[in-house]
Amino acid sequence: MTVSLDRRQLLAGLGVTLASLALARPALATTGSLLTAAPGELALPGGAKPTRTQCFNATIPGPFLRAKRNHPVKLRFANQLETLSTIHWHGLRLANAMDGVPGLTQQAVKPGAGFDYTFTPPDAGTFWYHPPAFGPFLSQCEAGLYGVLVVDEDEPPQVDQDLILVIDDWNIGPDGQILAAPITESKPTITVNSKAAETIRLAPNERVRLRLVNATATRIARLALAGFEATIIAIDGHPVDTPFAPNRGRIDLPPGGRTDIVVDGTLAKGSEAGIALDRDGDVVILAQLVASDTAPLRSAPLPPLVLPRPGLPVALALQKARRIAVSLPAHEGSGSGLPGKPLFSVKRGSLVDLGIANKTPIDQAVHVHGHAMRILHPFDDEWQPYWVDTVAIGPGETVHTVFLADNPGKWLLHGRACGPSRKDDLLAWFEVT
């Protein structure tokens, strides 16, 4: 069920008292950094007792890593869990051997063992890392094993604060522990940066960049922005063609999706503004924006941003594209394993038109590894003015995407039902030779 989040409803919810919280800020990812996956505990909002989790470096989210575009990164993964694991670098167009898919790009890392991930990010933007979100590894993601990687632009846009909001949901039983399967009659606990909510304080004429990350496994995060103006500058790590305002103040983030927005400090003192999420019919406040009682940071707001071009093709010759059709559900493997043969194989430099028909009664989210896609308009050869690595497809809908297969290797193509079933309704891979 989707509820309409109107401005009055959202602002009414902002009357709750929110603690002043320090938001997560990216830290430098240096060569030789260590990411250790291990059991942990988290005191969830409203929880009677700590929840057993899995986490990187004893925090949820894990360390906020920062890298530079076209500069090499080397990170050591240490597996101190009791199960196999790897790290998938979600959204990065990196070398195939570093993509972190067990049985396809590497062997799973055994308990007590480690693996060195070395890559050079070609794109700036907001990315994140986690185990591959399918089969036995999905439960690790749901237990909190994830973090955010920010890759800086060569010349980052001028902002005064650069903040990250990581959205997650937790299906918790009466004993305070994570359920193997959600209870349909109960609603999950929603967190942002593992807290109930965040407070964002804006000085007059201050500019803030908010990096929104949907770390849930099966929830489309339907967000409503009220009481302030925002501009979308990037989606799934890549700058949009031209910055634009959210349609009617709404942003839908599929599982794994990211959207970067900028907000200027033009709030009147005493006004109420915030970001809320639709949780299966009710409103959950994620962040409150507050006009700080300080002197203006500058005499006027900063001018509109001029964004760099992504390192992706400007033009796409659709008439030359290889057309691939997929109907969901379309599990190509057996059990939780990957299929032995690729869904399709193309030569490097080929254009792929991937049509995905959702024949199920529930929303689906499909994620492509190692590449970025354009979403085509349904009635012409135009496309949306941004690139994505994950696309949401409604029940009975067909979505066509197009991408340049310019990254050699074997790449996962993965789709999951956005609901309690947690089904892998698409588990396949394709090869670029």
Residue map of PLM features:
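N-terminal, post-signal-peptide metal-ligating segments of extracellular/periplasmic oxidoreductases
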Residues: 2-116, 151, 157-162, 174-209, ...
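Extended terminal and domain-junction accessory segments
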Residues: 30-34, 142-172, 241-363, 404-410, ...
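Short tyrosine-centred short linear motifs in exposed loops/low-complexity segments
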Residues: 70-71, 113, 121-127, 205-206, ...
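Asparagine-centered strand-capping/turn motif at beta-strand->loop junctions
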Residues: 77-81, 213-215, 356-360
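Histidine- and aromatic-rich segments of cupredoxin/plastocyanin-like copper-binding domains
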Residues: 98-99, 107-110, 174-310, 378-389
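Short strand-edge motifs at loop-to-beta-strand transitions and within beta-strands
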Residues: 113-117, 259-261, 389, 397-401
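Hydrophobic or amphipathic alpha-helical targeting/insertion segments
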Residues: 121-151
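Active/binding-pocket-proximal capping segment
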Residues: 227-239, 359-386, 418-422, 429-433
